[in-house]
Amino acid sequence: MSKLGEVSLEEDLEKLLSHYPQHAEEIQRAYEFAKEKHGEQKRKTGEPYIIHPLNVALKLAELGMDHETIIAALLHDTLEDTDTTYEEIKERFGERVAKLVEGVTKIGKIKYKSEQAENYRKLILATAEDPRVILLKLSDRLDNVKTLWVFREEKRKKIAKETMEIYAPLAHRLGVWSIKNELEDWAFKYLYPEEYEKVRNFVKESRKNLEEYLRKYVIPKVRKELEKYGIEAEIKYRSKHYYSIWEKTRRKGIRLEDVHDILGVRIIVNTVPECYTVLGIIHSLFRPVPGKFKDYISLPKPNLYQSLHTTVIADKGKLVEFQIRTWEMHERAEKGIASHWAYKEGKNPSDAGVYSWLRELVESIQGSTNPSEVLENLKSNLFFEEVFVFTPKGDLVVLPKGSTPVDLAYKIHTEVGNHCAGAKSNGRIVPLNYELKSGDVVEIITNPNKSPSYEWLSFVKTSRARNKIKQFLKKQERERYLSEGKRILERIREKLGLSHEDLINKIRERVRFDTEEELLLALGKRKISSANLIKLIFPKKKEEKEERRGSSTVFLEDLSNIKHEVAKCCKPIPGDEILGVITRTKGLVLHEKSCSNLKNVLRLNPEKVKEVQLQASGYFQTDIRVVASDRIGLLSDITKVISESGSNIVSSMTNTREGKAVMDFTVEVKNKEHLEKIMKKIKSVEGVKICKRLYH
């Protein structure tokens, strides 16, 4: 390392230590330990590796995090990239630091495709154990995204996209604006380099004139009026970050030149009453723009952000946005969750708890093993605008925009949701799919005889409601299968003239199952037919079976009655024209009639091919391909459509390149008509160009 590099490291370390004079010795020890462990390791940039953990620690120090988090930041890569053990960290720096380092390590290096969702799941679950883990990971990601220039373009875009879709929204939901804005701008730079440069140049050219305008015409006028009322305030202006400016042009369909509020004025006062007094003063000085006032003091955001926002028409007809808040609100707005987890000595981090939305997110993904479902739940919890409604008792409830009374019912309690029979909004009866609006007073009407239906899945907005409904329906379906299984078993018992106990014992001799319930489910689901079960118990006792002679058509109503296999090349489903090929080992192999793999069989052994009428009930797997213009939220929108159509996603794979996304899904459908309905809905999703069935 050059002497200049060593000096820079020493300066950064001194800067870090200056934040924690009482714990400087411990932090110095952690730095020396990490430096020794990483040894000669280099970053992709060619710099000494120790620069990275030091940068992560400095960012967390800016947020005012406790000294344990800073030590964990310095050590966060030692478990994964060096020979350091958990016990070694625990012995040298304490159990809480060791757990933090382990928490970050457990999240692992994010991989793509099938493992991506599982890593996100680990990220959220680790965060629930100690919210400092997510702040460590966000700071880690921020430092890494700044060095994306060292990678190939494809990898740069993948990491930038993930940063924009997951990490920046997480920072937003946790209220850590300083990290959120930087993550978005760096990701924006690599995802849309041309647009980034246009916005950067536009801000550079516009800022000077706007600053002069605010200093000359706006701030002096406001300051003079505040002094008249004896209000002590700090007045400053700040620039919107590049991505938010570009996003505004896309959202509103306007040109960059039409964005007039790239600079905003922030007024910080001592008390809440002063905030409202300042608001009145501003509205008396300048004309407010209708619909541009938001009171986040009375109605805080879910991440506890509070401020008054108003946009006014100031001198020379220019639009100016004001944010008014107290110092305490300002601290929370800048540092978000970090301002709540400044731990005292000996205090257990878990005592601080987590935000309710984070708990709900953990609950929604904890038991999920479906990668697409994990991603859907995660993204739906990160990307949403809020709507504020009230219960009849006056309790405030915050929900995603587009939520319904059913979402509110499940937000209140699972049992309220499961027995939701109707709703009133502002005293009027509304349908269950009514879209709630801010300010609505909503009363949920319950009925003990009412239960969820599949239809609810088509309109609920929150992942909590969707998961609770699915859980109920799954349980209900299981009970139905058990009841049907009991009925079939009783019919077999009567037919054979055996006692229940004797029948179960005879079945156990021939069929392997762990519990009687498992057997009942197999019978109820038609995984094993009553005829086959009787043959297994009494091989010589065969049921009379009507033979279809002189017919080349095979009617399949119960797939468990005949040995068969669905061809993986075309995956036929009920409603397709299907041909079955008789084979020695696999039984009847089912193909879609136009399948190219049938050509040789039809030419050489036509007698082995039978026409098949597949009339079985249940779900069948098939593949579809979706080609679309890539955008944030695309995967979430498509998986939501599939889920709401009553289909389950078995697997999915997404490839993106040059703004185009190609997504392959294996889905479960009832029949061809069901599949066509799903594909029609997918084609209506914004940006989708092609949705077709996929044959291999």
Curated annotation (Swiss-Prot):
Reactions it catalyzes: guanosine 3',5'-bis(diphosphate) + H2O = GDP + diphosphate + H(+)
Listed InterPro entries: ACT-like_dom_sf (IPR045865), ACT_dom (IPR002912), Beta-grasp_dom_sf (IPR012675), HD/PDEase_dom (IPR003607), HD_domain (IPR006674), NT_sf (IPR043519), RelA/Spo_fam (IPR004811), RelA/SpoT_AH_RIS (IPR045600)
Functional pathway: Purine metabolism; ppGpp biosynthesis; ppGpp from GDP: step 1/1
CDD domains: ACT_RelA-SpoT, HDc, NT_Rel-Spo_like, TGS_RSH
Biological process (GO), any one: guanosine tetraphosphate biosynthetic process
Enzyme nomenclature, EC number: 3.1.7.2
Domain HD as annotated: residue spans: 49-145
Xref: SUPFAM superfamilies: ACT-like (SSF55021), HD-domain/PDEase-like (SSF109604), Nucleotidyltransferase (SSF81301), TGS-like (SSF81271)
Family statement: Belongs to the RelA/SpoT family.
Name of the featured protein: Guanosine-3',5'-bis(diphosphate) 3'-pyrophosphohydrolase
Organism: Aquifex aeolicus (strain VF5)
